[in-house]
């Protein structure tokens, strides 16, 4: 496990070692966080909320 900081509440988040950029992790504060690559290291950011697609 990799120990990262939640960008929302600042608490620790355990992320599996084999996590890939783009994976979504839900934290106990209720935030949905996206794993991303920051200078070769895993980091977390708030995941984008996908809206409804009304296109046909």
Swiss-Prot record:
Pathway: Amino-acid biosynthesis; L-lysine biosynthesis via AAA pathway; Amino-acid biosynthesis; L-arginine biosynthesis. Disruption phenotype: Cells lacking this gene require arginine and lysine for growth. Formation of an isopeptide bond between the gamma-carboxyl group of the C-terminal glutamate and the amino group of alpha-aminoadipate (AAA) is catalyzed by LysX. The bound AAA is then converted to L-lysine in a series of reactions catalyzed by LysZ, LysY and LysJ. Release of the product L-lysine is catalyzed by LysK. Formation of an isopeptide bond between the gamma-carboxyl group of the C-terminal glutamate and the amino group of L-glutamate is catalyzed by ArgX. The bound substrate is then sequentially converted to ornithine which is eventually converted to L-arginine. GO terms for molecular function: zinc ion binding. GO terms for biological process: L-arginine biosynthetic process; lysine biosynthetic process via aminoadipic acid. The modification 5-glutamyl glutamate is found at residue 56. Zn(2+) binds at residues 6, 9, 27, 29. The modification 5-glutamyl N2-ornithine is found at residue 56. The modification 5-glutamyl 2-aminoadipic acid is found at residue 56. The keyword Metal-binding applies. The modification 5-glutamyl N2-lysine is found at residue 56. InterPro entries: LysW (IPR005906). A zinc finger (TFIIB-type) spans 1-34. The keyword Metal-binding applies. Keywords: Amino-acid biosynthesis, Arginine biosynthesis, Isopeptide bond, Lysine biosynthesis, Metal-binding, Zinc, Zinc-finger. A motif (EDWGE) lies at residue 50. Carrier protein that bears the covalently bound substrates for arginine and lysine biosynthesis; bound L-glutamate is sequentially converted to L-ornithine, while bound alpha-aminoadipate (AAA) is sequentially converted to L-lysine. Monomer. This is Alpha-aminoadipate/glutamate carrier protein LysW. It comes from Sulfolobus acidocaldarius (strain ATCC 33909 / DSM 639 / JCM 8929 / NBRC 15157 / NCIMB 11770).
